[in-house]
């Protein structure tokens, strides 16, 4: 078989590429996650499960092949039906059905997995669990709380239930040998990423989520500290006071020292609220306080390969980022966030620009805006304008902000959207076949000096579902090279004018072919 095309991108030189077919990866790579690959775990230590953090392969170990789908793979069930069921052949792992059947997470029935909404902490179903939580936190009902993070998410039943209540949750779980949790969540159409609370900050900015949830996550909080010491506003933690009263009391004391107020508790749900009053932090700034205040050497918003530290970052008082100062959902989507009040004009222009662009996209891709497209990624956004323009569609959007560009991810969360830091010179923290649509706007123009186009496009192919779409908006310098490599990945692409019909950039609307491995 011919060797894959090699493209060296130069910002001022048009790459010349001939279409060459990429080979298929071996079938045992059908769920390959390059930066969280269990095959490479033995190279890293077990301290605080650091081997489950991101460890990307060097360039000489990168795969230059197409990841095959499982034998019998079908197009995913469409939303909202997918919230309750998925095709077994798309995620053919029986272990969770066999090992967790008594917890009612999911069950296999014929050719499908069904999701009844159960779990270890949901004996009466996740709906009753969230009803109790809403009784404890009334702000979950009125649009005050819009974004949440769920650590150790299982099959994301909590996040799925919250979608019906207007709350958008990022479900987080590590890659494990069972190859299940995040993959099931995304197959259901629920936002999720691979990740673990270990030695590195999560890839989010400070003061981003409105609420954090952890259900039986089995973390010794009083030894390492809760996961919300630098970003979250609400925190729900499941406690068994009768069995662990001493640990619970220690946790309360630790959170008090971090300026969290014990807010409410009922049954096995305990809730703390993060203070928005900096007077508390002033009282803790004495030399012998624990945890101590952080110095100014590390940006609190930095979240890409930043080591966790045992210290507190004081929220910026002038910005008033507490929930009581934020507009309620959905108003907050269109209000200029306080983080960029000096750039209000630019924010409004960005919002108008993306409304025009998305209208044009829909004329070229009629599936955009209907149930065929559920899981969407905007690969290099600024303020989340593309996602905001799709807010009334059945889709949710993972907004990606470059770890090497303008740090605007906090603005995206202030709007009530979700996103993540990422560097596209590396693989994304997700399983193969997890997104229906990938959108990029000038990514290769921005990153041509760092990232090899071939590897970026192969990563796009890995995470795009068969028969999924890509909208690629790029400079004419790169558009033909992208089209040539896409042909070698078995994509069908068509070139179009932009909404302005300008010649300096073009659109590629691509669709990935559904194919099966010859070895299966």
Indicate residue ranges for each PLM-predicted region.
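Intrinsically disordered, low-complexity glycine/charged-rich regulatory or linker segments
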Residues: 1-144, 236-240, 248-375, 382, ...
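Conserved class I S-adenosyl-L-methionine
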Residues: 142-160, 170, 370-391, 398
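Conserved SAM-binding motif I beta-strand of class I
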Residues: 168-174, 194, 396-402
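S-adenosyl-L-methionine
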Residues: 182-206, 410-432
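A short SAM/SAH-binding and catalytic strip from SAM-dependent methyltransferases
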Residues: 198-200, 209-225, 435-451, 470
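A short glycine-rich, Lys/Arg-flanked "PGG" loop and its adjoining helix->strand segment in the class I
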Residues: 205, 210, 224-232, 433, ...
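Conserved beta-strand signature within the Rossmann-like core of class I S-adenosyl-L-methionine
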Residues: 231-235, 242, 466-475
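Short alpha-helix
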Residues: 241-258, 477-490
